[in-house]
Amino acid sequence: MNFETTIGLEVHVELKTKSKMFSPSPVTYGQEPNTQTNVIDWGFPGVLPSINRGAYQLGIMVGLALHADITRLTHFDRKNYFYPDNPKAYQITQSEKPLGTNGWVEIEVDGKKKKIGIAELHVEEDAGKNQHEDDGYSYVDLNRQGTPLVEIVSKPDITSPEEAYAYLETLRQIVQFTGASDVKMEEGSMRVDTNLSVRPIGQEHFGTKTEIKNLNSFVHVRDGLAFEEKRQQAVLLSGGEVRQETRRWDPDAKETLLMRVKEGADDYRYFPEPDLPPVAVSQKWIDDIQASLPQPPAERRQRYIEDWGIPAYDAGVLTQTKEMSDFFEATVAQGADAKQASNWLMGEVSGFLNAQHVELGQVALTPAHLAGMIKLIGDGTISSKMAKKVFKEIIQHDTDPDKWVHEKGLIQLSDPAKLTPIIDEILDNNQQSIDDFKAGKDRAIGFLVGQIMKQTHGQANPKVVNQILMAEIKQR
């Protein structure tokens, strides 16, 4: 029996604001517990929330970037449930009329493109965080309580773990490019809930779905879904029934484990939030936000390929983050060759960032200085070997590469009038190497070049050296 898989993803993205969704408390990651709160976050009686317009605007921005239809008149709802990290005993969200509907993203898996529909996206507040300590007590940190979120709910168009991975990666890039969120899973600013079901091919209704928790990376999402897909297929092939469950991914055991059985849908008793007014979104507001959106990553990739001849793979790497993409474009705008700029950013720059565990904005390197160094290589002022020394300087210090090269005497020696006497001296002292080369031993030329580079402290231009060397050997 063959099966088809249906996957639905709910992605919570933390919006990049200075204050919370319905209170003036600051939003700052990594602070001491319960220091970023006020009476609204704690749910004290009589306090009233107010809508963070900036957060709602970021939500619209995400919706437009995902090609969604923005709801012109909407309202917030109360989602009622009790949990220690939710002191109000309800969450303010959007249920009846979400911020946006009918969006889509285009993914690519194994060279094939596919559109994945987005059923809806809505703005809501985050809950706090429970902390279970070794002393046997559980503590509640409400710093996160009230942080603005946009929840993005996919349509059941995803049919494999690989498509789910591609969808999340594409979604992350699109949202990150808008600037609405930094979408860092390690800091909790992007979280994923998954639902998966399988059914025999040809069966019209969906199979019974299971939800998977504890998915802390895109790789965990892909691996967890792959395991659950096989587990459900095995249950059905053995004649059993798949139960509606919530399961937990164990990354060490590489399997999903049962957390609880769900016998029915949760009843959250939604009703309109009485303490907040409706939200009216004008067409001008939508148009202004649309005009402010940067070019999305897919369009940038295509432009790099068509305008600058960047290979498709390289263009994909350069558009992994907006920071890298903007830096690349700024470097080219400063006069650097696009392919060389791409090579340096993908090679030496990325290598340094990974080794130091820092981001591009945390180092001293500027587009102007990288472009300056690339131009020094291009015009022969420095060699590729010397460029690595220059690079180490300009990525760690705010140093002008041209000025530094001249101060340190690193200018490449390319003048034939200065190189010829040095080469002649080397040849005079190495007649055996000349004879070996003429006898067909090509490695002899490498020895001679090495001697010349040693004599010039590595500053001789290898291309010019080879030209003069061959000419001089011919005359002997």
Swiss-Prot record:
Q: Which InterPro entries match?
A: Asn/Gln-tRNA_amidoTrfase_suB/E, Asn/Gln-tRNA_Trfase_suB/E_cat, Asn/Gln_amidotransferase, Asn/Gln_tRNA_amidoTrase-B-like, GatB, GatB_C_1, GatB_Yqey_C_2, Gln-tRNA_amidoTrfase_suB_CS
Respond yes or no to whether keyword Protein biosynthesis is given for this record.
yes
Entry protein name: Aspartyl/glutamyl-tRNA(Asn/Gln) amidotransferase subunit B
HAMAP family listed in its UniProt record: GatB
GO MF annotation list = asparaginyl-tRNA synthase (glutamine-hydrolyzing) activity; ATP binding; glutaminyl-tRNA synthase (glutamine-hydrolyzing) activity
Q: Name one Pfam family in it.
A: GatB_Yqey
Keyword annotations of the record:
ATP-binding, Ligase, Nucleotide-binding, Protein biosynthesis
Which protein family is it in?
Belongs to the GatB/GatE family. GatB subfamily.
- Report quaternary structure and partners: Heterotrimer of A, B and C subunits.
Kindly give the SUPFAM superfamilies that the UniProt entry links to this protein. GatB/YqeY motif, Glutamine synthetase/guanido kinase
Q: Name the gene for this chain.
A: gatB
Keyword Acetylation included in the entry's annotation = no
One GO BP annotation here?
Answer: translation
Q: What does this protein do?
A: Allows the formation of correctly charged Asn-tRNA(Asn) or Gln-tRNA(Gln) through the transamidation of misacylated Asp-tRNA(Asn) or Glu-tRNA(Gln) in organisms which lack either or both of asparaginyl-tRNA or glutaminyl-tRNA synthetases. The reaction takes place in the presence of glutamine and ATP through an activated phospho-Asp-tRNA(Asn) or phospho-Glu-tRNA(Gln).
Main EC class the enzyme belongs to:
ligase
